[in-house]
Amino acid sequence: MATYVQTNVGLYWGGYSLASSFNAIALHLSNSPQDDTVYGDTTVSNASGLSTVTLEAEGFWQSTTDAVLQASLGSNEVISVTPVDQSAGSPSIFSKYTTSSYNPIAKGEVGSMMGFSLSAEGRGEKSVSGEILVIPATYTTSSESSTNASIGAVSATQSVYSALHVTAASGTLDVIVESAPSNWSGEATRITHTQFTAVGAEMKSAAGAITDAYWRVKWTVSGGGSFDFISSLGII
């Protein structure tokens, strides 16, 4: 199993790419077990409780990043972290969060960099460990699709999740997620994202069972415009 040194982490916060302002990101996944021990048990028993997703991060203050983070306080955002790089097939961890705290001047001493810190809490969605299908770039072609990816089937107890971050917009953008039983024929549309005409983000899902193992993202740019976006897919 490969290990990585953090040098090219990506952070997509709603409709913004903010990694260049950050120098530390931590994701915490937990569960709140509930004691269900009864007479006759010889050891403590716990039932699975509610799951929790938390993001904590810090970095160096910049006015443009500060404006985004202040506006997001108390609001819901789709956040994706790409812990290795932003290549197709690289890991992407995403979920919906509510920004619970933002400290624009978390630390600052004479002669040192002015730093900020923040925390965000999960907004009713599990954390999805997926992979990047569409790399962050500028797309102008009227209709394109990502390289087909063998991500696997979706069982009856699972769902497939798609995270889309649009960081620059001109015209209209329509994005769908397709699956196919082979590489590539017999495709079916599984997820249809809301049409984008401005920067923003969206996380959508489709419930299983889906027996297809191959997946791709397909998009159409209309109105003579161009869009910068990144798209990730995961199954949990």
Predicted regions and their residues:
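Solvent-exposed serine/threonine-rich low-complexity stretches and specific carbohydrate-binding patches
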Residues: 188-198
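Solvent-exposed edge beta-strands and adjacent loop segments
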Residues: 1-58, 62, 90-121, 126-131, ...
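Short conserved beta-strand and strand-loop elements enriched in small hydrophobics
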Residues: 9-11, 76-89
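Edge beta-strands of jelly-roll/beta-sandwich modules across compartments, strongly enriched
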Residues: 116, 129-131, 223-236
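Noncatalytic modules at the cell exterior or secretory-pathway interfaces
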Residues: 113-115, 157-162, 208-228
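Beta-strand signatures of extracellular beta-sandwich domains
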Residues: 174-178
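Extended, low-complexity, turn-rich repeat/linker tracts enriched in Gly/Pro/Ser/Thr and Asp/Glu
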Residues: 63-66, 165-173, 184, 222-227
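Extracellular and analogous surface-interaction loops
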Residues: 147-158, 166-168, 205-210
